[in-house]
Structure formats: structure tokens, C-alpha cells
């Protein structure tokens, strides 16, 4: 079986919903990343077999294909857009790696993009062509209509209740995320991930959601979103805009082209869970991944779990017995933000730049009751 390696990874800084990036469509968010890869790796770009991107609330029309054409890549390069909800970006990386393992191609661009600010409004279509009532807008995607179809916030509350994750634990974890993120912005770790872009004449190179100086006591002042609950705006991620791209190729080819370091994809797992508890998806996903590769949690140096809600990450940490020295050691989405279709690819990008780590996992809890996880080693 061929081996797939990630040899380059970059992302935009993540903008807040309605923030600096609010006027940019998904393909426009991706354009500077594609252009960066074109300029830095011209010999490789000419050999691309496919572009695979995750996206959840975009404007349709196969964003991967639209974006590569907008960026000026050859029209002979195909593109495919994947929707596995929040896990789409990680799924795109696994898809590309598996295609290489199977011998279907040797060079792929994978990643993800989301503009929550530019997400189209959706209107329910009437059953009758003669309908005269005012149109009804969809408030959100329906994740599991045949079940109780909880919102993501209700799902986080369900997880918090089942796994006894208190409000205090959730606020403590959120504070940790902001502190670690701020530290790793200051020391330059996170800046390695980010490609500065010019937006309306200004350089944009810092995640807008980060609150580096928020006092710890402030987290307890926020009211629960659901009456009587524990999930608040402070211990949940924000809605965000942003894009991520990774260059993935067959290992021998990477060496031939002069790439000397990166991530080796070892394996990936996607599972289903009760849709009422979507945030717990990383637990069986990571457990299955470890079992399949004859590893234990202690064998993994870094585990990146997307921080949609403090409740779900704390529950996963407790269920898997993950130490603080392993989990989200540069902070996470509670501070940096969660552009849905890009977030999984961002986790892998973060692992890419942890040059002193050897064995790593990225994992996502996914709306509708899913979880995915991928195992990487350094090459």
C-alpha cells in the first residue's frame, strides 16, 4: 500500500461572524491559499490529481471546483466538495490520503472552507404551487428529524448532563483554551499556521474570536443559552469564517521533490453515535482508531479534539482518560473559532506545525451523531 504524507499546510486567520471576512464568499477565502501554494510549489501544483474540500453552509455549485478555477489553477484539475458537517475538513484529508494509499493518485490538495457570514438563507418550499402564505425560513439544518433532532446547543447540554460536566468545569476549560491560545500566539507557534492576507487594504493575520485578556471570573457571568442549562456563549465556540489548505502526496514522490518533513497518515475512523449526544463522537472514534492500530491513549503525544463546546471536550477527555499535557496543548476553537467545514483541516494543520511531536490524533464531534478521528506520525 502506498503511503500518504502531508507536506504543507496553511490557513487564513479566522474571522468572526459578521467580522473582517464577512464580504468574502468561500471561493474568495480560498483564493490566497491556492495562490500561495502555486507560488511556493509550482512543480507540484502542475501534478495535482484532485482538490478535495469540506464545506457545510456554503453557496453550492461544488466550491472545491469553483475555488480552484477562481485561483487560476488549470481547468483540467477536478474538484470535489464534501459535507460531513463539522467533520468535513478532516474527512477531506482522510479522503485524499486514502486515494493515495489506494493508488488512485499521487498529489492532492485537501482542506476546508466556511463563510458563516455569507451562508445563504434557506426558505422552505411550499407543498402546493398555489401557496399564498408568507415564506418560512429554516432556522438551522435538520440533523436527525426522525429522532428528537436536538440543536447543537441542546446536544451539548445532553452530553454535559450524561457525563456530569458541571458549569464550573466548562468555564474552566474555556478559560484554559483562551490562555493557551494567547500564549501560543505570543510565542509564534500559531502564526506558523496562518497565511496573512490583505482585506480591504489591511493585513489580516490574527483570529478575531480570541479574547486574550478576559479575566477568569468573567466566564461565570454569562447566562446559560437554555434556561436551567450550563452551556453559555463563553464556554461555546463562535461562528466563524475561514479557510484551510493542505498539500498531500505519495511519500516516495515527496522525497523525490525535496520535502523533508511533515505528517504521515496512518489511519482514520468515522463512527455513528446517538444523535442526541453528537459531541461524544470522538470517544468511539478515537477508541476504535487506537484498537485498530494496537495503541493506547498513553502512546499518543497530542490529541486535538475540536472545541465546539467545553462540555463535549471535557466529557471526551474524561471518558478517554486524556491528560491535559496531551489535549489541545495550543488551545482550540473556543478561542480561535470554528468555521465548520474548515475546522477538521485546521486541527491537522496544527499538528503539522508541532514539529517536536511524533504520534498525534485529530478528532471531531459531528452534528447528527457522528465522530471522526485520524492518526498521524511524523515523517
Swiss-Prot record:
It holds the Pfam family Thiolase_N. The keyword Transferase applies. PROSITE patterns: THIOLASE_2. GO terms for cellular component: cytoplasm. It comes from the Bacteria. Belongs to the thiolase-like superfamily. Thiolase family. The keyword Ribosomal protein does not apply. The active site is at residues 86, 338. Keywords: Acyltransferase, Transferase. This is Putative acetyl-CoA C-acetyltransferase VraB. GO terms for molecular function: acetyl-CoA C-acyltransferase activity. It is an enzyme of class 2 (transferase). Its EC number is 2.3.1.-.
Amino acid at each position: 500500500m502506498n503511503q500518504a504524507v502531508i507536506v504543507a499546510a496553511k490557513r487564513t486567520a479566522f474571522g468572526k461572524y459578521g467580522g473582517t471576512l464577512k464580504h468574502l464568499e468561500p471561493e474568495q477565502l480560498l483564493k490566497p491559499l491556492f495562490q500561495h501554494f502555486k507560488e511556493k510549489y509550482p512543480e507540484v501544483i502542475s501534478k495535482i490529481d484532485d482538490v478535495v474540500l469540506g464545506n457545510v453552509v456554503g453557496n453550492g455549485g461544488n466550491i472545491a471546483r469553483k475555488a480552484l478555477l477562481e485561483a487560476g489553477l488549470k481547468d483540467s484539475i477536478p474538484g470535489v466538495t464534501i459535507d460531513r458537517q463539522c467533520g468535513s475538513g478532516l474527512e477531506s484529508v482522510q479522503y485524499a490520503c486514502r486515494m493515495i494509499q489506494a493508488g488512485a493518485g499521487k498529489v492532492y490538495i485537501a482542506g476546508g472552507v466556511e463563510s458563516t457570514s455569507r451562508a445563504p438563507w434557506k426558505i422552505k418550499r411550499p407543498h402546493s404551487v398555489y401557496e399564498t402564505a408568507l415564506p418560512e425560513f429554516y432556522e438551522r439544518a435538520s440533523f436527525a428529524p426522525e429522532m428528537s433532532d436536538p440543536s447543537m446547543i441542546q446536544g451539548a447540554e445532553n452530553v454535559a448532563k450524561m457525563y456530569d460536566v458541571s458549569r464550573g468545569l466548562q468555564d474552566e476549560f474555556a478559560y484554559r483554551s483562551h490562555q493557551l491560545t494567547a500564549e501560543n500566539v505570543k510565542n509564534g507557534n500559531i502564526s506558523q499556521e496562518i497565511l496573512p492576507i490583505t482585506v480591504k487594504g489591511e493585513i489580516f493575520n490574527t483570529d478575531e474570536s480570541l479574547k486574550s485578556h478576559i479575566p477568569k471570573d468573567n466566564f461565570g457571568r454569562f447566562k446559560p443559552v437554555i434556561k436551567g442549562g450550563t452551556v453559555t456563549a463563553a464556554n461555546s465556540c463562535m461562528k466563524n469564517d475561514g479557510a484551510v489548505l493542505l498539500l498531500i502526496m505519495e511519500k516516495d514522490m515527496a522525497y523525490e521533490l525535496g520535502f523533508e518533513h511533515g505528517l504521515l497518515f496512518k489511519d482514520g475512523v468515522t463512527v455513528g453515535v446517538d444523535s442526541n449526544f453528537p459531541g461524544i463522537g470522538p470517544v468511539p472514534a478515537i477508541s476504535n482508531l487506537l484498537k485498530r492500530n494496537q495503541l493506547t491513549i498513553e502512546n499518543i503525544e497530542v490529541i486535538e479534539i475540536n472545541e465546539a463546546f467545553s462540555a463535549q471536550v471535557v466529557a471526551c477527555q474524561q471518558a478517554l482518560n486524556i491528560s491535559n499535557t496531551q489535549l489541545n496543548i495550543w488551545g482550540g476553537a473556543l478561542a480561535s473559532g470554528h468555521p465548520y467545514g474548515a475546522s477538521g483541516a485546521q486541527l491537522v494543520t496544527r499538528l503539522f506545525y508541532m514539529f517536536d511531536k511524533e504520534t498525534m490524533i485529530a478528532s471531531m464531534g459531528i452534528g447528527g451523531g457522528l465522530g471522526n478521528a485520524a492518526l498521524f506520525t511524523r515523517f
